[in-house]
A protein has these predicted regions:
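Hydrophobic alpha-helical membrane-insertion signals
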Residues: 29-86
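Hydrophobic, small-residue-rich alpha-helical packing segments that form membrane-like cores
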Residues: 190-206, 221-224, 235
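Active-site cores of enzymes that catalyze phosphoryl transfer or operate on phosphate-rich substrates
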Residues: 2-5, 10-15, 86-158, 163, ...
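CE4/NodB-like, metal-dependent polysaccharide N-deacetylase domain
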Residues: 162-187
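A structural motif corresponding to the C-terminal end of an alpha-helix
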Residues: 42-57, 126-142, 176-178
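Short, solvent-exposed turn/loop segments enriched in Gly/Ser/Thr/Pro and often Arg
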Residues: 59-66, 148, 184-193
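N-terminal-proximal low-complexity accessory segments that begin disordered
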Residues: 3-44
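Short catalytic/ligand-binding loop motif for oxyanion handling, primarily in non-cytosolic enzymes
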Residues: 15-18, 66-72, 152-156, 192-196, ...
Length: 286
């Protein structure tokens, strides 16, 4: 039987949102939700595997805007305030649903989830999740790659200087947070244009991630399609995403996030609860 290699490559990005002029800002919640629902759980899985002697060997892209937000003291404090309010709400929900076993089980699950997230964020990672990811990379458990400075769509940038700045600033930001130069880059939106490999080679990057059609409609077409890295003229390797696998974790129609057995996104205490009950947990604008 033929054997192959599987590369699990994750990409983490959020637009930069930081508004110190307001006590709270709705779009900052995107970061707080991602910390609780994605970044801390990822660290838990990676660290658990490493403790068991299993090196995950997962590649993880962390973009410069996300790295800056995760290491920002203001946003770190605001996340702690945010998750503390969620813990308080969950405690109230555990008491409110005491006579409804199914709902009570859900409330207890969320109470445990947010309590653990708060404890890990404050005590294990000292509010900076970057340190957790950096330690995993230094231990050889994962490899972290970079991205464009602002996640800008490179093919639509008309000036080579702008494209070069995106790549070079992405490299410098990576060095700032991870104390070494990156080997790879997730091209913003996986968007390729002819000649981008030369800019990547200038930055010392050895591989990049693109969408499948960049390879499948290339000239000449690689013999193995997207199922092997493609070496570009500048000597930088291109890895294409597998379409079917991507849909399983991304598509609302065929992937697991859109399946009600995974989660019911339209059931929300904000709609179910009385206004006076949920008011302390809403933004000040209601």
């Amino acid at each position: 039987m033929e054997q192959g290699l599987l590369s699990i490559i994750l990409h983490a990005h959020l637009p930069f949102v930081r508004h110190p002029e307001y006590p709270e800002f709705l779009e900052e919640d995107w970061l707080y939700e991602a910390i609780s629902e994605t970044y801390i759980p990822l660290l838990n899985v990676f660290e658990g595997l490493a403790v068991d002697g299993v090196m995950p060997r997962v590649t993880l892209g962390l973009t410069p805007p996300l790295c800056e937000m995760l290491s920002d003291p203001l946003l770190q404090q605001r996340y702690l305030d945010h998750v503390t309010k969620l813990v308080e709400l969950c405690e109230s929900e555990v008491m409110r649903t005491a006579k409804h076993p199914a709902m009570n089980e859900t409330a207890r699950m969320y109470l445990n989830h947010f309590s653990a997230a708060r404890d890990l964020f404050e005590n294990r990672y000292r509010r900076n999740l970057i340190s957790g990811f950096r330690a995993l990379q230094e231990a050889g458990a994962i490899e972290i790659i970079t991205c464009g400075a602002t996640h800008g769509f490179l093919p639509l940038m008309t000036r080579t200087e702008a494209r070069r700045a995106q790549v070079q600033v992405g490299r410098l930001n990576y060095i700032k947070h991870f104390n070494r130069a990156p080997r790879g880059i997730w091209l913003p939106e996986c968007a390729y244009y002819t000649g981008v490999d030369s800019l990547l080679e200038e930055a010392g990057l050895r591989f990049f991630i693109v969408d499948a059609h960049a390879i499948m409609f290339g000239t000449p077409q690689p013999r193995r399609g997207i199922y092997a890295p493609t070496l570009t003229p500048a000597g930088v390797a291109a890895f294409a995403r597998d379409v079917e696998t991507s849909e399983q974790v991304w598509s609302a129609d065929t992937g697991y996030p859109g399946d009600p057995d995974y989660r019911e996104f339209y059931r929300d205490l904000g709609f179910d609860g009385e206004y006076d009950y949920i008011k302390p947990y809403l933004h000040s604008d209601g």
